[in-house]
A protein has these predicted regions:
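Beta-rich globular "head" domains
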Residues: 1-12, 151, 155-158, 162-166
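Glycine-rich strand-loop-strand elements at beta-sheet edges
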Residues: 7-65, 142, 147, 169-175
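Collagen triple-helix signature
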Residues: 44-47, 59, 85-91, 114-117, ...
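Predominantly extracellular/luminal regions of secreted and cell-surface proteins
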Residues: 108-122
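Polybasic, low-complexity association/targeting segments
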Residues: 129-130, 154
Length: 175
């Protein structure tokens, strides 16, 4: 039997919203037979620049023992398209829709793998949504903060954190 911790690739941050953490799954006592197993480690997504051509990309899935952790959702941009955070293992934070001068939406997380990205906080001075993490949604601790990663999977004396979301950007104001 084996125990596993599988984390997918984290997403790129958009020109404004933070990228979501890669989805994270754990398991204990999984029965395996002697043999060779293929394990795919998902790559991280690319960050995007502000503007119409700067859309970020999602992280890639990680797969092991027939279990798939979903790549993180990219953060939203400041543009006429790509302003919404994307769905992913953990969702991407919201950006800004320059067509309508309004906030984009944040991306949802995947159940059991991570949380949603955060919303744009205009009263805080156009602080864009943080990416979701394994332990909480983006912008939970404060506007623009990435969601916390999960703890409790340490080996030895340390307690590392896994699958934390990226922080959102901030601007001087959009109109």
């Amino acid at each position: 039997d084996v125990d596993h911790l599988i984390v997918a690739g984290g997403a790129g941050g958009g020109g404004r919203g933070g990228g979501g953490a890669g989805g994270m799954l754990t398991g204990t006592g999984v029965a395996v037979s002697a043999g060779t197993y293929t394990i795919t480690v998902g790559a991280g997504g690319d960050g995007g620049e502000s503007g119409a051509t700067g859309t970020a990309t999602n992280g890639a899935n990680s797969v092991a023992l027939s279990v798939t952790a979903t790549g993180g959702g990219h953060g939203g941009n400041n543009a006429t398209s790509g302003y919404d955070g994307s769905v992913g293992g953990s969702g991407g934070g919201a950006g800004w829709n320059t067509n309508t001068s309004s906030a984009g939406t944040y991306g949802a997380g995947t159940a059991g793998q991570g949380y949603a990205g955060g919303a744009l906080d205009v009263p805080a001075g156009y602080v864009y949504g943080g990416g979701g993490g394994k332990a909480e949604a983006g912008s939970t601790d404060a506007a623009g903060y990435g969601g916390d990663g999960a703890t409790g999977y340490g080996i030895g004396a340390t307690t590392p954190y896994y699958a934390g979301g990226g922080g959102g950007g901030r601007s001087n104001g959009d109109s």
